Amino acid sequence: MNQVIKSFKNKHILVVGDSILDKTVLTRAIGISLESPTLKTREIEENISFGGASNVAKNVLALGAECTFLTLLGKDEYFKNYVELGKELNMMSTMSNRKNTVKSRYWVEKEDVRYKYLQINRGTSAPISENEFSELFSKFKKVLFSVDTVVFVDYDTGVFSNKNNISLMIKAANNAGKATIVNSQISDGENRYPRFAGATLFCMNKVEALSNYPLFTATDAGMKGLCNLLSTDVCVTLGDEGCIASISGTTIKIPANFVEPIDPTGAGDSFLAALSVSLPEQDFR
């Protein structure tokens, strides 16, 4: 295990995908409005951090690997946050006339207990234009031969809106001999994993596995059925039960390490980052 972790510093991961900013506003409950049944709070603090594909890139760096992050951005009032936060990510962005995606979560604290009261999602999922993709793909090909693994992170905000574009990127990576990992969120939309045919490995959660293969179970038979349907290797995260992976027909189930959860936001991104720096060794333990 220690040797695998030490090897991370020699890895260069290319993360391609949809950028998200996570805006967290922590408040304290102070009462109920007299005019309407509205909860009144006082702001304690506010912070903005990377989410989506940008959070995967951030976690790759935290593991000691080198990372290049390729994404599509809009030059709006949140662009400066990407510039500031993205300095360490070696971010290569293609500019677009779009609103950047921001997920604002409002937390209320009362008597040392915190709960999420409201989430507001902002941004657009407009398809990437032909000119935008041409610029993005040019940057993709330029950096491709210097990386070990390519990770496609799809949050359905535009980067992967065109199936033919996806095929071009996967084909280029395969021709360059690079492993490709795909994570495609389906919590707010359709199942888009079939668009990524030809990738090395799909990484998904149990809900996404069931969306692809309704007969899925976290067993050898369930994994083989899922892999046969998708024609690729698959790793499925199982929450507090760990994960199960099928690599070249061999199924491995790994229990989770016990931790005291504080906020599960971004847990999947962290797992994906760890998987990406481990994939060449195929040593998930």
Which residues are covered by each model-predicted region?
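Conserved phosphate-binding/catalytic region of the ribokinase-like
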Residues: 127, 146, 161-181, 185-198, ...
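Structural recognition of alpha->loop->beta junctions
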Residues: 89, 193-212
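Active-site metal-binding loops of divalent metal-dependent hydrolases
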Residues: 18-19, 155, 186, 270
